[in-house]
Amino acid sequence: MSQYFDEEPSATSDPLEVVWSLPDGELRLVTDHGVFGYGRVDQGTKLLILKAPLLPPTGDLLDLGCGTGALALSMARRSPAATVWAVDVNRRARELCASNAERHGLHNVSVVAPDDIPDEVRFDAIWSNPPIRIGKTALHELLLRWLGRMADDGSAHLVVQKHLGADSLQPWLTASGHPTERIATGAGFRILHAR
């Protein structure tokens, strides 16, 4: 069965547009089978977009596990002078995110596979609704890889469902060298702020 974290989804394509009204304007996303959030904007993603603090106005920003691009597009709108890196292993997700950014005229979004970001890039902010279902070990490796690329004054905001391990992820991140606090909750989700 095809999973949203597969490189090449085997699910039959059936694009569907979703529309979400935000304080800074309407967000129109084309979604598809085999990509996280088919036919909707996930509740955790919504919470992160609505509750995360202001982003740096410039620099390099990362949407880790971009899916169709809800986070990346929101970041690009809020920080038009920044470069937003939208990263996903899933080819279909990258194609949708790039297309959605283009439809919104957001030219500061660079959609890439994980290994295509230059090594010297350091992130001033990371937003992620991480792929929890890849498994605990793989998730920890993923987070350590990318949080380790934060700029000295950078920070990450992660949204995780409580019943999928948010409350155990927080102390693990702190013990792994990334002091983490919970800054918001809602609809069974936690927003974690890591440094």
Predicted segments, located by residue:
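N-terminal auxiliary segments of SAM/dcSAM-dependent transferases
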Residues: M1-L22, G34, Y38
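Class I S-adenosyl-L-methionine
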Residues: S2-D14, G165-R195
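General small-molecule cofactor/ligand-binding pocket signal
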Residues: V30, S110-V112, E181-I183
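Conserved SAM/SAH cofactor-binding pocket of Class I
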Residues: Q43-S128
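Glycine-rich phosphate-binding "P-loop"
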Residues: A125-T137
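Short "lid" loop at the C-terminus of a central beta-strand within the Rossmann-like core
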Residues: I132-I134, Q161-A166
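A short glycine-rich, Lys/Arg-flanked "PGG" loop and its adjoining helix->strand segment in the class I
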Residues: H140-D152
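Conserved beta-strand signature within the Rossmann-like core of class I S-adenosyl-L-methionine
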Residues: D153-V160
